[in-house]
Regions:
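Structural signature of hydrophobic alpha-helical transmembrane segments
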Residues: 42-55, 92-101, 171, 175-185, ...
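N-terminal signal-anchor module of multipass membrane proteins
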Residues: 1-53, 57, 315-319
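Loop-to-transmembrane alpha-helix initiation sites
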Residues: 120, 124, 206, 228-236, ...
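Conserved mixed alpha/beta catalytic, RNA-binding, or beta-rich assembly cores of soluble enzyme
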Residues: 196-223
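C-terminal ends of transmembrane helices
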Residues: 58-70, 106-118, 188-198, 241-250
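Long hydrophobic alpha-helical segments that form multi-pass transmembrane helix bundles
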Residues: 117-189
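Alpha-helical transmembrane segments in multi-pass membrane proteins
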Residues: 25-33, 48-60, 77-82, 86, ...
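Membrane-interface helix-loop-helix junctions at boundaries between adjacent transmembrane segments
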Residues: 77-78, 83-149
Length: 319
């Protein structure tokens, strides 16, 4: 017979999905945020996004070229990192500083740890934190290019002491200050719908993260308006949809995803409500990224008929 059995080590591919197709879906889901940022902040938003993407792809290509490794840029993961990092900075961010964040994200966080699938934290997330710590003044310029916008709208909603002054419609549509990707909740929701519809991500993490934050704020403030304003403000929605759901740095079981989402809500609420820092999403995500291996271990599904080693040893000793 001419039939040959090809035996290879697991895992065996049982799906037509590839890294490239998954990343392509994420890019499509990010498009509403990119378009909304251009409408709200002007065409410079597109320049910031383009520079970030080109820098990430270039750094990945150059690193692999110098170390004579296979070129992975066709999987589009560097493009996703570039867009997400661009959506995490203000429109006036100096491009040179942004490129430093791209360098940290791609070379230090991603490639030095072995490339895609090996990073301990979300590359774009760490890049944002490095930019925030290193260039705080640039990262905190919450202004519209249009000088006609009033001061309340041009400030980030998290900086407004009286949340009753915040319009929920303005928060949902993005008529307020903030970084490029976090302002328009409508665009983020459209991206979420696409990702869930294409089964690129599970709704478990965004729902448990945002839902727990809403409940915590509702209990703390006794106000539905304040709780909704907290959910629609800052980087919560963008982080919950595009960063907390990262395949590498999030749990793989449903139970683990729910635990992860609620834990993110607890940490973010604690930082925002009791801490001196008005945001909290980035640091909460980084903190919980470190706990993902333990969450995976604790929530791992036990195969039917599995006997724990301690119990097996005890039974063997009794014979």
């Amino acid at each position: 017979m001419d039939t040959k059995l090809i035996v290879s080590a697991s895992p065996h591919v049982r799906s037509e999905e590839t890294t490239q197709s998954l990343m392509a879906n994420v890019i499509v889901a990010l498009c509403p945020c990119v378009v909304a940022s251009a409408i709200i902040f002007g065409m410079r938003a597109l320049l910031v996004t383009a520079v970030s993407v080109v820098a990430c792809v270039a750094f990945e290509w150059l690193y692999c070229k110098l170390l004579k490794r296979p070129n992975p840029i066709s999987d589009l993961s560097a493009v996703v990192t570039g867009i997400i990092l661009a959506m995490n900075v203000p429109v006036g961010m100096p491009l040179g500083q942004l490129i430093i964040g791209d360098l940290v994200a791609i070379v230090i966080v991603k490639q030095l740890f072995g490339g895609i699938g090996m990073n301990f934290a979300n590359p774009a997330l760490v890049g944002r934190i490095v930019l925030f710590i290193s260039f705080a003044s640039s990262m905190n310029k919450w202004v519209f290019p249009d000088a006609a916008v009033d001061q309340l709208s041009s400030a980030t909603p998290l900086a407004v002491a009286d949340t009753s002054k915040l319009s929920l419609l303005d928060l949902f549509m993005g008529i307020h200050g903030g970084v490029l990707g976090e302002t328009c909740a409508l665009a983020i929701v459209l991206g979420l719908i696409y990702l869930v519809a294409t089964k690129t991500i599970s709704i478990a993490i965004p729902a448990s993260y945002v839902g727990s934050m809403f409940i915590f704020y509702l209990i703390a403030t006794h106000s539905v308006h304040a709780a909704l304003a907290a959910v629609l403000s800052g980087g919560l929605l963008f982080g919950a949809v595009f960063m907390a759901t990262d395949y590498v740095t999030s749990p793989f079981t449903l139970k683990g995803k729910l635990v992860y989402g609620v834990a993110l809500g607890i940490v973010t609420f604690a930082i925002r409500y009791w801490g001196s820092y008005t945001e909290g999403v980035s640091f909460a995500l980084l903190f919980m990224n470190l706990w993902v291996p333990y969450i995976n271990d604790l929530t791992r599904q036990t195969p039917y008929g599995y006997i724990k080693p301690a119990k097996k040893a005890k039974e063997g000793a009794g014979k």
